[in-house]
Amino acid sequence: MSRLSGIEAINFYGGSAYLDVEELARHRQLDNSRFENLLMSQRSVPLPYEDPVSYGVNAAEPIVSAMSPRERDSIEMVITCTESGIDFGKSMSTYIHEMLGLSRRCRLFEVKNACFSGTAGLMMAASYALSSGAKALVVATDLARFTAADAGEALQSDWSFAEPSGGAGAIAMLVSQQPHVLRLDPGAYGLYSYEVMDTCRPVPDSEAGDADLSLLSYLDCCENAYRDYASRVAGVDYQGTFDYL
């Protein structure tokens, strides 16, 4: 049995419309220098007929269309990864699976977690591909949602800077034992998690949070996850081991 798994193919869909970040920040009466530091010039905007499902399908369709019927039938798992879910019970993977015309001999489910769900889905798919020899399709898809008042004033001033830097997009990854794009190292990982109230979205169109707390939590998790990684993987070096950083 192969001990290799990872990303066989990958595709991105960023929508068909965008806004100029500088113009948007000026309209919201924000300091443009903050967005210059982020090296941003444009942000995608979902059109009224677009949602996380349509974004996900557009990301995955070129990958699936390039596969032979036999290869498509080897996809035994479709995972959607999002924090923009459209249903409390039904997974978006069911819609994406149907629109892509994939075999019904397939597992369909969704992972919800801010920022981490795409990575979690990829790791889950890689483990499945490693154990079964089948392929898995991972679709990370999100639409940023911001509610703003008229006259350029954001309803939530603390989060008004997030609007110009948040957009919409989807990435589809075909995961298998033929990792032409990226090979994952099985068993090499670091764990560190805890609850922190840095962000909260209790209803679909409203969000609250603490950006400073979020940043500090990320740094804390990065440091301690690396320590756990180093305890599992011999000879690891932060500067030399991770070629893609």
Enumerate the language-model features and the residues they cover.
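Short glycine-rich or small-residue beta-strand-to-loop segments that form or flank ligand, phosphate
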Residues: 76-84, 110, 245
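Phosphate/pyrophosphate-binding loops at sites that engage ATP/ADP/AMP, CoA/4′-phosphopantetheine
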Residues: 32, 59-76, 223-243
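Conserved catalytic cysteine-centered active-site region
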Residues: 33-37, 42-50, 84-135, 141
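Short coil/turn connectors at secondary-structure junctions
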Residues: 2-4, 73-76, 103-106, 130-136, ...
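Flexible, glycine-rich active-site loops centered on histidine and acidic residues
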Residues: 130-172
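Condensing-enzyme catalytic core mediating Claisen C-C bond formation in acyl metabolism
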Residues: 1-50, 156-228
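Active-site-adjacent elements of ketosynthase-type condensing enzymes
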Residues: 87-95, 123, 131, 143-154, ...
